[in-house]
Protein backbone atom coordinates (compact mmCIF):
# COMPACT_ATOMS: atom_id res chain seq x y z
CA UNK A 1 0.00 0.00 0.00
CA UNK A 2 0.99 3.56 -0.47
CA UNK A 3 2.50 5.45 2.45
CA UNK A 4 0.90 8.65 1.26
CA UNK A 5 -2.63 9.22 2.36
CA UNK A 6 -5.12 11.07 0.31
CA UNK A 7 -6.70 13.98 2.08
CA UNK A 8 -9.65 15.96 0.78
CA UNK A 9 -8.20 19.25 2.04
CA UNK A 10 -4.82 18.75 0.50
CA UNK A 11 -3.87 16.68 -2.48
CA UNK A 12 -0.73 14.73 -1.78
CA UNK A 13 -0.93 12.82 -5.02
CA UNK A 14 -3.26 12.16 -7.87
CA UNK A 15 -6.87 11.50 -7.06
CA UNK A 16 -7.36 7.72 -7.19
CA UNK A 17 -10.88 8.14 -8.52
CA UNK A 18 -9.64 10.03 -11.60
CA UNK A 19 -9.58 7.78 -14.66
CA UNK A 20 -6.12 7.03 -16.05
CA UNK A 21 -6.88 8.67 -19.37
CA UNK A 22 -7.72 12.03 -17.73
CA UNK A 23 -4.60 12.31 -15.57
CA UNK A 24 -1.98 14.87 -16.52
CA UNK A 25 0.49 13.44 -19.02
CA UNK A 26 4.22 13.63 -18.34
CA UNK A 27 6.27 16.39 -19.90
CA UNK A 28 8.61 15.43 -22.70
CA UNK A 29 11.91 14.22 -21.27
CA UNK A 30 10.70 13.90 -17.67
CA UNK A 31 10.46 10.66 -15.79
CA UNK A 32 7.58 9.37 -13.76
CA UNK A 33 7.90 9.59 -9.97
CA UNK A 34 10.17 6.95 -8.49
CA UNK A 35 7.63 5.38 -6.18
CA UNK A 36 5.27 4.51 -8.96
CA UNK A 37 5.85 1.89 -11.57
CA UNK A 38 4.37 1.89 -14.98
CA UNK A 39 2.42 -1.19 -15.75
CA UNK A 40 4.03 -2.83 -18.70
CA UNK A 41 2.58 -5.74 -20.56
CA UNK A 42 4.62 -8.86 -20.04
CA UNK A 43 6.85 -9.68 -22.96
CA UNK A 44 5.14 -11.95 -25.42
CA UNK A 45 6.81 -14.77 -27.21
CA UNK A 46 6.53 -14.87 -30.95
CA UNK A 47 3.89 -17.23 -32.26
CA UNK A 48 5.20 -20.66 -32.90
CA UNK A 49 3.94 -23.06 -35.46
CA UNK A 50 2.56 -26.29 -34.16
CA UNK A 51 4.41 -29.27 -35.49
CA UNK A 52 2.54 -32.49 -35.94
CA UNK A 53 4.49 -35.62 -36.59
CA UNK A 54 3.81 -37.56 -39.74
CA UNK A 55 2.68 -40.60 -37.77
CA UNK A 56 0.18 -38.47 -35.83
CA UNK A 57 -1.15 -36.95 -39.03
CA UNK A 58 -1.50 -40.36 -40.67
CA UNK A 59 -3.21 -41.68 -37.55
CA UNK A 60 -5.72 -38.83 -37.72
CA UNK A 61 -6.28 -39.56 -41.41
CA UNK A 62 -6.87 -43.24 -40.65
CA UNK A 63 -9.35 -42.31 -37.93
CA UNK A 64 -11.19 -40.04 -40.34
CA UNK A 65 -11.30 -42.81 -42.94
CA UNK A 66 -12.57 -45.30 -40.36
CA UNK A 67 -15.30 -42.87 -39.34
CA UNK A 68 -16.23 -42.38 -43.00
CA UNK A 69 -16.38 -46.15 -43.47
CA UNK A 70 -18.63 -46.53 -40.42
CA UNK A 71 -21.02 -43.91 -41.80
CA UNK A 72 -20.96 -45.59 -45.22
CA UNK A 73 -21.74 -48.99 -43.69
CA UNK A 74 -24.65 -47.47 -41.75
CA UNK A 75 -25.99 -45.86 -44.92
CA UNK A 76 -25.62 -49.14 -46.82
CA UNK A 77 -27.50 -51.00 -44.07
CA UNK A 78 -30.38 -48.55 -44.31
CA UNK A 79 -30.42 -48.71 -48.10
CA UNK A 80 -30.34 -52.51 -48.21
CA UNK A 81 -33.16 -52.67 -45.65
CA UNK A 82 -35.28 -50.48 -47.93
CA UNK A 83 -34.33 -52.57 -50.97
CA UNK A 84 -35.19 -55.78 -49.12
CA UNK A 85 -38.66 -54.55 -48.24
CA UNK A 86 -39.10 -53.46 -51.85
CA UNK A 87 -37.90 -56.86 -53.09
CA UNK A 88 -40.30 -58.75 -50.79
CA UNK A 89 -43.23 -56.85 -52.24
CA UNK A 90 -42.25 -57.95 -55.77
CA UNK A 91 -41.42 -61.61 -55.11
CA UNK A 92 -44.18 -64.01 -55.97
CA UNK A 93 -45.00 -66.79 -53.49
CA UNK A 94 -44.64 -69.41 -56.26
CA UNK A 95 -40.90 -69.75 -55.62
CA UNK A 96 -40.33 -73.23 -54.25
CA UNK A 97 -36.56 -73.03 -53.71
CA UNK A 98 -35.66 -69.56 -52.46
CA UNK A 99 -32.53 -68.24 -54.11
CA UNK A 100 -30.20 -65.58 -52.90
CA UNK A 101 -30.76 -62.40 -54.84
CA UNK A 102 -28.30 -59.57 -55.36
CA UNK A 103 -29.94 -57.63 -52.53
CA UNK A 104 -29.70 -60.56 -50.12
CA UNK A 105 -26.00 -60.97 -50.91
CA UNK A 106 -25.50 -57.24 -50.36
CA UNK A 107 -27.27 -57.45 -47.00
CA UNK A 108 -25.05 -60.36 -45.98
CA UNK A 109 -21.89 -58.52 -47.04
CA UNK A 110 -22.91 -55.31 -45.27
CA UNK A 111 -23.59 -57.26 -42.06
CA UNK A 112 -20.15 -58.83 -42.37
CA UNK A 113 -18.62 -55.39 -42.93
CA UNK A 114 -20.40 -54.04 -39.86
CA UNK A 115 -19.25 -56.92 -37.65
CA UNK A 116 -15.67 -57.45 -38.80
CA UNK A 117 -14.99 -54.40 -41.03
CA UNK A 118 -13.49 -56.79 -43.60
CA UNK A 119 -14.52 -58.55 -46.77
CA UNK A 120 -11.72 -60.83 -47.84
CA UNK A 121 -11.16 -62.94 -50.91
CA UNK A 122 -11.24 -66.09 -48.78
CA UNK A 123 -14.72 -65.16 -47.51
CA UNK A 124 -15.81 -64.50 -51.11
CA UNK A 125 -14.40 -67.85 -52.27
CA UNK A 126 -16.24 -69.66 -49.47
CA UNK A 127 -19.47 -67.96 -50.48
CA UNK A 128 -18.85 -68.90 -54.12
CA UNK A 129 -18.32 -72.54 -53.14
CA UNK A 130 -21.62 -72.55 -51.27
CA UNK A 131 -23.56 -71.28 -54.28
CA UNK A 132 -21.50 -73.04 -56.94
CA UNK A 133 -24.42 -75.28 -57.97
CA UNK A 134 -26.43 -72.31 -59.13
CA UNK A 135 -25.02 -70.14 -61.89
CA UNK A 136 -27.62 -67.47 -61.20
CA UNK A 137 -26.63 -67.17 -57.53
CA UNK A 138 -22.95 -66.98 -58.47
CA UNK A 139 -23.71 -64.09 -60.83
CA UNK A 140 -25.82 -62.46 -58.13
CA UNK A 141 -22.98 -62.75 -55.62
CA UNK A 142 -20.44 -61.27 -58.02
CA UNK A 143 -22.83 -58.49 -58.98
CA UNK A 144 -23.62 -57.67 -55.34
CA UNK A 145 -19.93 -57.45 -54.43
CA UNK A 146 -19.17 -55.32 -57.49
CA UNK A 147 -22.03 -52.95 -56.58
CA UNK A 148 -20.74 -52.66 -53.01
CA UNK A 149 -17.22 -51.99 -54.27
CA UNK A 150 -18.56 -49.10 -56.32
CA UNK A 151 -20.83 -47.71 -53.60
CA UNK A 152 -18.10 -47.37 -51.00
CA UNK A 153 -15.91 -44.27 -51.46
CA UNK A 154 -12.58 -45.02 -53.09
CA UNK A 155 -10.46 -43.49 -50.30
CA UNK A 156 -11.87 -45.85 -47.63
CA UNK A 157 -12.12 -48.92 -49.85
CA UNK A 158 -8.70 -50.33 -48.80
CA UNK A 159 -9.95 -50.46 -45.19
CA UNK A 160 -12.55 -53.08 -46.16
CA UNK A 161 -10.05 -55.81 -46.98
CA UNK A 162 -8.75 -57.16 -50.26
CA UNK A 163 -12.01 -58.14 -51.96
CA UNK A 164 -13.73 -54.86 -52.80
CA UNK A 165 -10.67 -52.97 -54.11
CA UNK A 166 -9.95 -55.81 -56.52
CA UNK A 167 -13.57 -55.93 -57.68
CA UNK A 168 -13.83 -52.20 -58.22
CA UNK A 169 -11.13 -52.32 -60.86
CA UNK A 170 -13.00 -54.97 -62.86
CA UNK A 171 -15.69 -54.49 -65.43
CA UNK A 172 -19.30 -54.80 -64.25
CA UNK A 173 -20.48 -58.41 -64.27
CA UNK A 174 -23.08 -59.39 -66.81
CA UNK A 175 -26.47 -59.94 -65.21
CA UNK A 176 -27.92 -62.05 -68.01
CA UNK A 177 -25.86 -64.32 -70.21
Curated annotation (Swiss-Prot):
Ranges annotated as biased composition (Polar residues): 1-10
Start and end residues of each stretch annotated as Disordered: 1-38
Matches recorded under Pfam families: Paramyxo_NS_C
Family note: Belongs to the morbillivirus protein C family.
Name of the protein in its database record: Protein C
Taxonomy of the source species: Viruses, Riboviria, Orthornavirae, Negarnaviricota, Haploviricotina
Amino acid sequence: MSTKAWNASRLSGPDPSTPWSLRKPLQHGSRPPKGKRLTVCPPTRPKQTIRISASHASQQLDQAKAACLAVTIKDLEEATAVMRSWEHSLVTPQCIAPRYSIIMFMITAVKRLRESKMLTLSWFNQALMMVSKSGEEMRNLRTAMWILANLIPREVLPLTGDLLPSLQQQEPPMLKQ
